[in-house]
Design a protein with these regions (language model features):
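N-terminal organellar transit peptides
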Residues: 1-105, 109-198
Length: 198
């Protein structure tokens, strides 16, 4: 393509497709990260590493995260949520479509961090539900092991969301045992977001 030079893909972004990296890099120069996929180990390259670089640079410009995710890996989601909960620079997080499952946990991480402002469009929805983890037979000896592990995962998700939002234990327990779809207006009231965009 004439006039367009492909950038070399840095080793730390090895999980990013080379074509997508061109757009990824251009947005990073504007301190913007678009996350529009399932949560997996790739968040190390696509979210954590850029956020860490921004946190350690000399700029006071806020970082923008555009989030639209169906959720995914519990462990990878908690990796990012725990990091964001104590992030030391300004972040504008914009939910464009939905933040489901572990993406809702990541969203809730900004509830008590004054550096993070979470915005959503009126048509945005958030989904909270019990976590469920698929384990192979080799990873758990018995069904009881799997159930006990899943219960611990559910409890971790529950405690994290309750501690970072206005969601009470009673409300969570009455809603999250099934698929709990939350509108933008309800999310605002529950401190899952800070602002509804027009």
């Amino acid at each position: 393509m004439e006039g367009f030079e492909f950038l070399a893909l840095p080793e730390k972004y090895s999980g990013v497709d080379i074509v997508n990296y061109q757009y990824f890099h251009q947005l990073l120069e504007k301190r913007t990260i678009v996350f529009n996929s399932e949560i997996s180990e790739d968040i190390i390259e696509t979210l954590y590493l850029p956020l860490r670089d921004f946190e350690n640079d000399d700029s006071d410009e806020p970082v923008t995260i555009i989030l639209n995710s169906v959720g995914g890996s519990v462990s990878d989601g908690f990796f990012l949520a725990n990091y964001l909960a104590s992030y030391k620079k300004k972040i504008n997080m914009i939910i464009t479509g939905y933040a489901a499952s572990m993406a809702a946990v990541i969203l809730s991480a900004g509830g008590k961090n004054e550096n993070i402002t979470r915005k959503a469009y009126p048509s945005t929805y958030i989904l909270i539900h019990d976590g469920y983890v698929a384990l192979s037979a080799s990873e758990a000896k018995t069904a009881n092991d799997i159930m006990a592990f899943n219960n611990r995962v559910d409890e971790n998700i529950r405690n994290f969301i309750i501690s970072n939002t206005n969601i009470t234990e009673e409300l969570y327990d009455s809603k999250a045992r099934k698929q709990w779809f939350i509108s933008a207006q309800e999310a605002l009231e529950l401190n899952l977001i800070d602002e509804i965009m027009e």
